UniProtKB/Swiss-Prot annotation:
Protein name listed in UniProt: Imidazolonepropionase
Assigned protein family: Belongs to the metallo-dependent hydrolases superfamily. HutI family.
Job description of the protein: Catalyzes the hydrolytic cleavage of the carbon-nitrogen bond in imidazolone-5-propanoate to yield N-formimidoyl-L-glutamate. It is the third step in the universal histidine degradation pathway.
Matches recorded under Gene3D superfamilies: Metal-dependent hydrolases (3.20.20.140), Urease, subunit C, domain 1 (2.30.40.10)
Residues that coordinate or bind 4-imidazolone-5-propanoate: R75, Y138, H171, Q239, T316
Amino acid sequence: MRTLWQHCHVATMAEGRYSAIEDAAIVTSAGLIEWIGPRAELAPVEADRTVDLGGAWVTPGLIDCHTHAVFGGNRSGEFEQRLQGVSYAEIAAQGGGIASTVRATRAASEDELFASARQRVQALMRDGVTTIEIKSGYGLDLANERKMLRVARRLADELPLAVRATCLAAHALPPEYAGRADDYIAHICDEMLPALAAEGLVDAVDAFCEHLAFSPAQVERLFIKARALGLPVKLHAEQLSSLHGSSLAARYQALSADHLEFMTEEDAIAMAKAGTVAVLLPGAFYFLRETQLPPMDALRRHGVKIALASDLNPGTSPGLSLRLMLNMGCTCFRMTPEEALAGVTVHAATALGLGDSHGSLEVGKVADFVAWQIERPADLAYWLGGDLPKRVVRKGHEISN
């Protein structure tokens, strides 16, 4: 069906800028953008449907390119403990932290995980999200990592949403491998990853490169295996210290390196040369009350593409609003509203390997967009919370009004 969408203004986000078109029109057909531009330049078109957008601003559908949306349990009790002065180490010694989420995730059925994840993902969708990445990493064995990734695939099947599934088995050491990180990495490489990839459950491979997780050498073994399986890689890097994980990610042409508060200028140069996207996660920065800012000037100076994401997870960023992350990117990390919007559209798409099909409003790309009743695009980063009036369009079909 061919649809004409008109009486709108468009922030196309092509090349990471607003690239605004006022008094615009969009023609969609077969789920793709067939034409976009000033309405005055549109030749007569035979449309099956014409939609008046009432002067709305249209942006690409928002993309949350880093989430841990599938998990069992709840860690709000730990939040209370931390605010009362209990340290993370003390909480972990009590069996809390990521270990508690692993236990709860392992104990939950696939249906239970699906039901809880669906609620969280639908909250993000209400913010205009049309594409999401979901990581595993709370199962830490083959059966439970498979269970998490199957839930990610089910969410894609049952919701009007594009989902990319990332295997993050190298998130933490499972209790059965305590003190044997090398053995666990070997288990992932030799058994878990080949099996999950063969089942079609994995779009990318991620790891947590940090003193309390896995070393650069261990991560590199995982990257070599991912490359052999034809899978792109991503990396949690430089969140708490500098191990130059982001440079390692760049050497393997990673889609992205994420967090990056402690990255160096040399890391930024390596990422720029490799085309690796910097995914910033202000929700975790805020929730953990961190003080080390990502090196924004170095990222800009060397032309690294910068994305933003929710990092939705139960321990360090229980954030259900990607629009809130736009504001946090501006207020915490000193991004401009234009940079922030690019970070949840065109650059987020690149961070998922979807840059050719998603993230900007251009002819031939997927017709995922949101029509917002706002005065200017910066409003999306300005307003804190609330449900801005909007229409959400996925593959040319309206899914929310």
